[in-house]
Amino acid sequence: MTLQQQIIKALGAKPQINAEEEIRRSVDFLKSYLQTYPFIKSLVLGISGGQDSTLAGKLCQMAINELRQETGNESLQFIAVRLPYGVQADEQDCQDAIAFIQPDRVLTVNIKGAVLASEQALREACIELSDFVRGNEKARERMKAQYSIAGMTSGVVVGTDHAAEAITGFFTKYGDGGTDINPLYRLNKRQGKQLLAALGCPEHLYKKAPTADLEDDRPSLPDEVALGVTYDNIDDYLEGKNVPQQVARTIENWYLKTEHKRRPPITVFDDFWKK
């Protein structure tokens, strides 16, 4: 088995999907989890205005709506969390995503004060954060807020990780990568677009250039620039297609060096890191 085949198998990626079937699969997955653990009353998700959180948010609200109708349990809710750092550059996109999702509840937590306070505390301990590490601080502060909200609403935190993100480890460890349940896991980027199109999402929310937008020195840096490959390249690779050798090397290098991000903390029983 080639490394490409191993990666595809590990991430559960498929070369083709039926959008309606995958929507149903994710919604049923969320419903089944909530029914298995009836003490869970809320799904909590940060909404950025990008493709992934818009899709995950819509699926969450659909699952909650169906469960309330089927069970009569009105205590169930989906909480969409706005988590700007100061003023968000694509604020209108975020508002458009909220309008599309129609969440039960919307909370806004501006993380700038908390990030600056943490940075100052570290500075007083003689640790000066680089712009890149400050970006990770933002991602972790966002997740911290979501877990506090989940803790106070008997909830779980929903993630947006999918195959095209997991393959490169393009997330912050214990930031946006630290979640409870990931309904998009298995899909690549273009497949996520297919689901949003089937759901009637405004096109500009999934046709915009994806960006983590964590770095102050490089605001709205496109993911594809940071990664050195395009999502079309990544999606082709995940679909088992032949890609240029340099593209394959770049993708596989990202996969191998970020393996620790896709695993629990390493123990004496693990040996993957010895490869």
Curated annotation (Swiss-Prot):
UniProt xrefs under SUPFAM superfamilies: Adenine nucleotide alpha hydrolases-like (SSF52402)
EC numbers: 6.3.1.5
Annotated positions binding Mg(2+): 52, 165
Q: What UniProt keywords are attached to this protein's entry?
A: ATP-binding, Ligase, Magnesium, Metal-binding, NAD, Nucleotide-binding
Protein family (similarity comment): Belongs to the NAD synthetase family.
Principal EC category: ligase
Describe its partners and assembly state.
Homodimer.
Q: Which InterPro entries match?
A: NAD/GMP_synthase, NAD_synthase, NH(3)-dep_NAD(+)_synth, Rossmann-like_a/b/a_fold
Q: Which reaction does it catalyse?
A: deamido-NAD(+) + NH4(+) + ATP = AMP + diphosphate + NAD(+) + H(+)
Its pathway? Answer: Cofactor biosynthesis; NAD(+) biosynthesis; NAD(+) from deamido-NAD(+) (ammonia route): step 1/1
One Pfam match, by short name? NAD_synthase
Task: Report if keyword Oxidoreductase is assigned.
Answer: no
Query: Which residues make up the binding site for ATP?
Result: 46-53, 160, 189, 211
Q: An example Gene Ontology cellular component term from the record?
A: cytoplasm
Q: Does the keyword Ligase apply?
A: yes
Gene Ontology molecular function: ATP binding; glutaminase activity; metal ion binding; NAD+ synthase (glutamine-hydrolyzing) activity; NAD+ synthase activity
Q: Tell me the protein's name.
A: NH(3)-dependent NAD(+) synthetase
Entry-linked HAMAP family: NadE_ammonia_dep
Please give a single GO biological process term from the UniProt record: NAD biosynthetic process
What is the recorded function of this protein according to its Swiss-Prot or TrEMBL entry?
Answer: Catalyzes the ATP-dependent amidation of deamido-NAD to form NAD. Uses ammonia as a nitrogen source.
Q: NCBIfam families attached here?
A: nadE, PRK00768.1
